[in-house]
Amino acid sequence: MASPILTSQRHFYSIGHLFPCGQLLERSRFNRRSKQLIWLVQFIRKAMSEMLPSDKLAIIDSFPLPLCQPVRNHRASIFKGLADIGYNASKHLWFYGFKVHMLVTLSGYILNYVVTPASVHDIKVVYELLEGCKQSVILGDLGYLSSELKKDLEQEGYHLWTPFRKNMTGAEEHNNWKVMAMRRTIETRFSELCRLFDIEHTLTRSLAGLQLRMEQIILAHNLRYFEMN
């Protein structure tokens, strides 16, 4: 389950007898009920986002969700027809699975996410990711560098900032280190999701199970941004 110590549901159930509530719901029954309540978890997450104070800035990025070791990329059959092979530039790694695209505030609150096959380019998901976004300034990495995308987003009321490549005119002036540092905070959030919730590893074998896991992790992550009285 999503906790700083327990990232395995099996491990959680193995110590269930330590809780004062006594007998826990049987695992398969718990999972069936949880999947039936995906809509509720999603509703709570979106309602929480509406409660956030207005902010001008948000950050977009993606991370890999591999389903097997690279050596099995061309033999994997899990999620056949849905997952595929993609390349992760930051890790210099080809992987089979999905890609998770996220929209995050500067403070680290996850506003939205989209899961796609691994081969889908980041630019293809931007409009879906920004659906309902109240932030007007969007920071992205070189994967979002596109004059056409920038122009189209400006017509939608968004200002997209990405760094320039080093060989581009005006790159040294444009690539302000303060803005670059703000953009990199999303990488810190991804590291936290991996460390606390093991988000890059999943044993689920169904789309409903994958969606439930993502919704649970994001909800647990976002809850800490609200003062619980």
Q: What positions do the PLM features span?
A:
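Short alpha-helical elements
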Residues: 1-229
